[in-house]
A protein has these predicted regions:
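Residue-level marker of regulatory loop/turn positions in helix-turn-helix DNA-binding domains and
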Residues: 94, 115, 147
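Asp-based, Mg2+/Mn2+-dependent phosphohydrolase catalytic module
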Residues: 1-11, 103-106, 119-218
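N-terminal helical cap/lid subdomain that shapes the substrate entry/recognition surface
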Residues: 3-110, 133
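Residue-level signature of catalytic and energy-coupling elements of molecular machines
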Residues: 20, 116, 151
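Hydrophobic beta-strand core positions in alpha/beta domains
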Residues: 113-114, 191
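Short, flexible loop segments at the rims of nucleotide/cofactor-binding pockets, characterized by
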Residues: 88-92, 117, 186-187
């Protein structure tokens, strides 16, 4: 499908963060490898990437091999995410074409929001580190909704916060769980191939698959 066919008529753009606004997957993968070894568990790249879009608690329970209490999962999450931020900080940058797309949306009067499964500290790290917080009318993190992707909660929460009906929203995602969540919310979805292959994202029924935001700027 051509970009215009997906983007035309949109009143809001809702962006996932990890792997979408920022191409940071490699640093999350490195952090999970180091972190999981601390707990005597070796994860493969395929496992980590395959779980992209799931909650951190899901990851922690896979590492432990058992259910985790809320306190235990939170403690482990804080440890892993601190490691990730340390690894990624010297490389923090917007994904190619993201700034241009955000600027174009602003000129067109399209409302922008962030809806992420990331913890608040990671979202603050990116938005404040890149000085783009004021671009977004709403920022939704994992503490603001009950069910993680592929449930639609994060995107529906974002749409409610900005006052735009789901059919008028376009979601930008990089993960299969995110694509499924966007469709479950009744939204169109553009998927980037930063963490999943084109074939995988097309099989998940993404409305449009692109390698980067620059393809949307033609």
């Amino acid at each position: 499908m051509k970009p215009n066919a997906v983007l035309d008529g949109a009143k809001a753009y809702i962006f996932d963060m990890d792997g979408t606004l920022v191409d940071n997957l490699a640093y999350h993968v490195r952090a999970y490898h180091i972190f999981s070894r601390r707990y005597g568990h070796e994860l493969t790249d395929a496992q980590i990437i395959g779980w992209t879009g799931a909650t951190n608690r899901y990851f922690m329970e896979r590492i432990l091999g058992r259910p985790a209490s809320a306190d235990e999962a939170k403690r482990m999450e804080d440890e892993k995410e601190s490691l990730y931020r340390t690894l990624y900080a010297p490389h923090l940058a917007l994904a190619p074409g993201a700034r241009e797309l955000l600027d174009r949306a602003h000129r067109a009067g399209i409302v922008c929001a962030v809806a992420s499964g990331a913890p608040t500290q990671n979202i603050d790290f990116v938005l404040d580190g890149l000085r783009i917080r004021d671009v977004f009318a709403a920022v939704v993190d994992a503490s603001q909704y009950a069910r993680g992707k592929p449930a639609p909660d994060c995107f529906l929460t974002a749409a409610a916060k900005i006052g735009v009906a789901p059919p008028d929203c376009v979601v930008f995602e990089d993960a299969v769980y995110g694509v499924q969540a966007a469709h479950a919310a009744g939204m169109r979805v553009v998927a980037l191939t930063t963490s999943s292959s084109r074939a995988t994202l097309e099989a998940a029924s993404a409305d449009l698959v692109v390698a980067s935001f620059t393809e949307l700027m033609a």
